[in-house]
């Protein structure tokens, strides 16, 4: 969701990303390539297929004309200008991790955003994969207050799955889509230092972020790489901890002075009425969302997500959005349209 306005007539559209520019613009737009890539990196591009309710020629199922594709691309210009060169931290999880179609959508969105000059950073968890491996090893998964109880054996599996499997798979997918990703965890370059959560006696090796040192990330994003970060880190003694990925994303966004924090979730966003999906709140400030928590309108698993957003905003992040990760190309809808794809929280 952005506050940019365009003079073009409003349309309802969705993006399908493909490779490269030659299907849309005959590779004559160097400004739409990585500005910081060295000469050895190839040029990236994208085309956009629009599915709209008007004009009738599109509604009939005919392929959009080249002119119409260019029109849709030109409507993205104000949003590209607004966010070009800005850091966007995205937390990836939920249904978007288990559906191949949604996973492909997230990856292509990240590549497109990087191609037009944004600086995306991806933070991920991996609950479904962890649960599957625990089941294969006949280790029961246990949760308390939404947090995974993590003993020493479980912690070893969490690290193995998040860092060794999920992270590297995402890096490979992003690379295959045309960008260059670098896989990291909180351990690398002392990016994150963990500490145990207050109720660690009940939860085991579940941690929270004690410190962030983003110096290892800055040269990566400066040179056009997409960092992909697994949400595990160690304390000062070297003990590994499992950290909530929302928390990691929020703390990284704050440390980097990000323009935007985006949490992909399995809900439409923040609802005025939890029982009514049509009551989505498009935009709300910190004061308003705190009042919703007090009134019980924000409850359950949404509370830690909202608090994560509030904390990041209080530390200088411009906006934080909770968006519907079940929707294909929700990242593009959130950043490249006024409508957005969920709820944007402002300071």
From Swiss-Prot:
Inhibited by arginine. Inhibition is relieved by binding to GLB1. Transmembrane segments: none annotated. It catalyses: N-acetyl-L-glutamate + ATP = N-acetyl-L-glutamyl 5-phosphate + ADP. Residues 1-50 form a transit peptide. Gene3D superfamilies: Acetylglutamate kinase-like. Its EC number is 2.7.2.8. It is found in: Plastid, Chloroplast stroma. Keywords: Acetylation, Amino-acid biosynthesis, Arginine biosynthesis, ATP-binding, Chloroplast, Kinase, Nucleotide-binding, Plastid, Transferase, Transit peptide. L-arginine binds at residues 260, 282, 334-337, 342. Pfam families: AA_kinase (PF00696). InterPro entries: AceGlu_kinase-like_sf, AcgluKinase_fam, ArgB, Asp/Glu/Uridylate_kinase, Glu/AcGlu_kinase, NAGK-C. Belongs to the acetylglutamate kinase family. ArgB subfamily. HAMAP family: ArgB. Interacts with GLB1. Interaction is dependent of MgATP and inhibited by 2-oxoglutarate, arginine, glutamate, citrate, and oxaloacetate. This is Acetylglutamate kinase, chloroplastic. It comes from Arabidopsis thaliana (Mouse-ear cress). The gene is NAGK.
